[in-house]
A protein has these predicted regions:
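The alpha-helix within a helix-turn-helix
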Residues: 1, 12, 110
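Short pre-functional
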Residues: 1-7, 97-98
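Conserved tyrosine-mediated DNA breakage-rejoining catalytic core shared by Y-recombinases
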Residues: 4-50
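Short, polar N-cap/turn motifs at the start of nucleic acid-interacting alpha helices
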Residues: 19-21, 85, 105-124
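Catalytic-site neighborhood detector that most strongly recognizes the C-terminal catalytic loop/helix
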Residues: 30-32, 113-139
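Active-site/catalytic core of tyrosine-dependent DNA strand-transfer enzymes
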Residues: 41-84
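Short basic/aromatic active-site micro-motif
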Residues: 84-103
Length: 143
């Protein structure tokens, strides 16, 4: 979820036939037709292909056949292990914030990673930039 900025529901609906090399095809829930594409980092794509192969998952079967509630528990337990309160959507938000703060253009974060319909949604989503961060970027720009 985190590396591809995918929503938990999108991840839970994925089947092997939805994975094309480094793309995850997100289908319209009503028609089943391709609605959006989430791009996968190479390591994620490699691990996902291996997971599908190692577990003998059929092309039409869900890769992660768990409920949303079960996914919440998995993510919560992972957060507990490192001492933070964590929900599935936090992973998507963190990935987008990390990309933005690492210098990825806001247009890429918005349209490609988050697949938002407008930049204004992404700006609200990413939140306010702290004074410390603003100063760091100014220093990076002007040495």
């Amino acid at each position: 979820m985190a590396r591809a900025c995918m929503r938990v529901g999108e991840v839970l609906k994925l089947t092997p036939k939805d994975i094309e090399d480094r793309k995850a095809i997100i289908r319209d829930p009503k028609s089943g037709k391709e609605a959006e594409v989430a791009f996968l980092p190479q390591k994620v794509a490699d691990r996902l292909h291996k997971y599908i192969s190692d577990n003998g998952i059929k092309p039409e079967d869900r890769i992660f056949p768990i409920t949303y509630a079960a996914a919440r528990v998995v993510v919560k337990k992972a957060g507990d292990l490192v001492g933070i309160h964590l929900k599935p959507h936090d992973l998507r938000r963190h990935a987008a914030t990390y990309a933005s703060r690492s210098g990825t253009p806001i247009e890429i974060v918005s349209k490609i990673l988050l697949r938002h319909s407008s930049l204004s949604i992404t700006q609200i989503y990413l939140g306010k930039i702290s004074d410390v961060e603003a100063i760091r970027w100014i220093d990076n720009l002007h040495g």
